[in-house]
Amino acid sequence: ELVALTAYNRMLHEQFPELKQHRVSLHSLFLGNPGTGKTTVCKIFGALLHEAGALSKGHVVICDRGTFIGTLWGDEERAMKQVVEMAQGGVLMIDEAYLLNGKNENDPGKIIVQLLMNLLADESQRDIAVVLCGYKEPMNELLETNPGLLSRFPNRFEFADFSVDELLEITSRRIEEYSYRFTVKAWQKYTDMIALAFSARDTETWGNARFIANQLERIYIQHATRCVKQPPKNHNDLLLITPEDIVPIEMPRRKNRIGFGV
């Protein structure tokens, strides 16, 4: 809808250049756990806004709190200026933006937030879209602590965790990319393992596609180790993942609540 409205405004301006344009804010919030595709969608977002005529380039510059913090007075302002110049014509994505929520008055995060507010209020900075990314609840705390930010980011997108079926689909695509394949028993063992991990996940920190990537990396290493120790008789089996290659997941321990059970 945001892209459509932007494209419509462009068409309207081309046909009736004398009309005053309604400015559409491109600044957005991407909220969700790691591995839910926020960075990927941000790149698509930039490309679509470029195609719609809202951004002159559509590229994405990714940064975080550490990008802006220095050791000398004024480092934050210099870093912000440099990053904004790099992102001109595209999208400035600030990952884990909730870390800008300073816990005390001297926290440099407060300076960065104020510099960001100044950027958003600058009418000359129209050829840039700022996207703040992070976990939902910490991001809400950032917005509550800095109410001026909320009005500057009218576009809110929430990224839900992938389902078990979606995680298995991600797995299939990743292994096909490298020509690996599972035996029937190995796939069953893997799917049971992912389903169990999903049911026991911490919904606030679950890694989603990143979790799958990490598990596959462990499987690849185990598979390679096995093949070196016992080379397959058939060269086609060099890419065949067996049950022995499926490395068990260390299940996270659930936090015990303080108090007495009834």
What annotation goes with each model-predicted range?
Residues 1-26:
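Pre-Walker A (pre-P-loop) alpha-helix and adjacent loop at the N terminus of AAA/AAA+ ATPase modules
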Residues 19-58, 85, 153:
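Walker A/P-loop
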Residues 65-75, 99-110, 156-158:
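Flexible beta-alpha connector loops of hexameric P-loop NTPases
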Residues 222-262:
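C-terminal engagement/docking regions of AAA+ P-loop ATPases
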Residues 58-87:
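Short glycine-rich substrate-engagement loop in P-loop NTPases that contacts/grips substrate
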Residues 52-57, 141-145, 150, 159-205, ...:
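Conserved C-terminal "switch" segment of AAA+ ATPases
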Residues 207-229:
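C-terminal helical "lid" of AAA+/P-loop NTPase domains
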Residues 98-131, 137, 144-150:
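Conserved catalytic/switch belt of AAA+ P-loop NTPases
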